[in-house]
Design a protein with these regions (language model features):
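Conserved catalytic core of sirtuin-type NAD+-dependent deacylases
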Residues: 1-177
Length: 177
């Protein structure tokens, strides 16, 4: 680590567990049950095709994920990563988490490969907006400009990773360690 030209930190749901967030799979995980209350697999409910067909169903589940994230604070792991970034010239965090806790801890060089639940994007005109939480949002929320349904800027099951995040990761990898 002392001799590395760059450091890449990779995190997933486990890093936010000490902040009180459940992991997605396993005992106590958000997706512990095989099926949702609607009798559908969570992978089907939280998918792009379902968002197009039944946005209210997708949003009900996304809102429950956001509610779990609401008010949660970065933990010591998030803080240490942010401190490392401030002390080293090139530190990049690649995270699968959509909770935004790395940024909340002060990290600036974060690649959120699965997106961020606090950014909404219009499915009609691609307008984006940041939201602190979903409290008070009509579900599904609609774009103020074109009235199309908005979606959280997260990767749903079956969707491709965001090209900009993948390109940034590729740039970091090509720059070497």
């Amino acid at each position: 680590l002392r001799e590395a030209r760059a450091v890449t930190v990779m995190t997933g749901a486990g890093v936010s567990a000490d902040s009180g967030l459940p992991t997605y799979r396993g005992i106590g995980g958000l997706y512990e049950d095989a099926d949702t209350d609607e009798g559908l697999p969570i992978e089907e409910v939280l998918s792009g095709p379902m968002l197009a067909r039944r946005p209210e169903l997708v949003w009900r589940h996304i809102a429950s994920i956001e509610a779990v994230c609401r008010g949660v604070q970065p933990n010591r792991a998030h803080q240490v990563i942010a401190q490392l970034e401030r002390r080293r010239e090139r530190v990049v965090t690649l995270t699968q988490n959509v909770d935004g806790l790395h940024g909340a801890a002060g990290a600036e060089q974060v690649i959120e490969i699965h997106g961020n639940i606090h950014t909404l994007r219009c499915t009609g005109c691609d307008r984006t907006r940041a939201v602190q939480d979903y409290a008070g949002l009509a579900l599904p929320p609609r774009c103020e400009r074109c009235r199309a349904v908005e979606r959280p800027e997260v990767v749903l099951f079956g969707e491709l990773l965001p090209p900009a995040a993948v390109a940034r990761l590729q740039d970091e990898l090509e720059a070497g360690f």
